[in-house]
Amino acid sequence: MQTLKVDLGERSYPIHIGEGLLDQPELLAPHIAGRQVAIISNETVAPLYLERLNRSLAAYSVISVILPDGEAHKNWETLQLIFDGLLTARHDRRTTVIALGGGVIGDMAGFAAACYQRGVDFIQVPTTLLSQVDSSVGGKTGINHPLGKNMVGAFYQPQAVLIDTATLNTLPPRELSAGLAEVIKYGLICDEPFLTWLEEHVDALRNLDQVALTEAISRSCAAKALVVNADERESGVRATLNLGHTFGHAIETHMGYGVWLHGEAVAAGTVMALDMSQRLGWISAQERDRGIRLFQRAGLPVIPPEEMTEADFLEHMAIDKKVIDGRLRLVLLRHMGEAVVTDDYPKEILQATLGADYRALAQLKG
């Protein structure tokens, strides 16, 4: 087992990474203050792992709230089911909410914990690659709004993150690839040597090699922890973690939440960010193509929805958390391994990126 730390002073917390951690109650006990525990999971994950987690929590009074699965249910109506469960069981301020599932479950359980009686403890137990390397770390919680993704939420840090890498053995290949989009992101924005490592190990990752997966998860979490330590509330450098997300969120919102997985939209959105970075002269065409090749090898889409027009993108991108005083800030690559957040770009460059022939780019060889 490896343990990393998110260093936020009194609100610091560990990230435990390893196989079989669901069966180690001693990792959970130090982070549960009271006797009441509420496990929040979904209809897909609960049949696989809820019983094991319950066994590790045998010393506590535990309830479970099982939600419908999928991004389409990340909304107010589903959030109310969590509050219904907590209130019906008369859980008090010393309850601990545990999120058992992927990013949707973690975001909603964390937001519910932030709101319930003005804040109760929660623990992240992520079961998808995407949630293990990204959404479970850093305290972003929330739900979607019909007009924009993740527009209603709170920064609320967990007490601990417990990453059992064995849960990836039941993850569908499409979901695994979606998680790899966020892994690749770290190489692009802050760790070019990691990008090289990913090029060498992407096949092993897709084949669920536990050694490779543990390394990828550990390096991703370490990268994110460093950024969160420096900028918890995304006033500066943390925004670079959103490479590809402005374009990607536009895809998710326009196509309907859940039609494209988050990681799939991020991959296509990152290709658009690579294209724009190249048009600005910050990276070369060869470097742009290097990123595209890696996304393709990871089994991810590199062509945005062809039915989306420039106007569609701009409409959705105008409702983005990085918009300040009406100006759209984008995360782009100044160099491979170095991202910047900027609103200083010619409008014509953005228009060219939105109208680019991504099908032609997807045909590149090498």
Curated annotation (Swiss-Prot):
EC class: lyase
Pathway terms, separated by semicolons: Metabolic intermediate biosynthesis; chorismate biosynthesis; chorismate from D-erythrose 4-phosphate and phosphoenolpyruvate: step 2/7
Function, as annotated: Catalyzes the conversion of 3-deoxy-D-arabino-heptulosonate 7-phosphate (DAHP) to dehydroquinate (DHQ).
This enzyme's EC code(s): 4.2.3.4
Name assigned to this protein: 3-dehydroquinate synthase
HAMAP family: DHQ_synthase
Binding site for Zn(2+): E182, H245, H262
Gene that this polypeptide is encoded by: aroB
Gene3D superfamilies (alphabetical): 3.40.50.1970, Dehydroquinate synthase-like - alpha domain (1.20.1090.10)
Keywords noted in UniProt: Amino-acid biosynthesis, Aromatic amino acid biosynthesis, Cobalt, Cytoplasm, Lyase, Metal-binding, NAD, Nucleotide-binding, Zinc
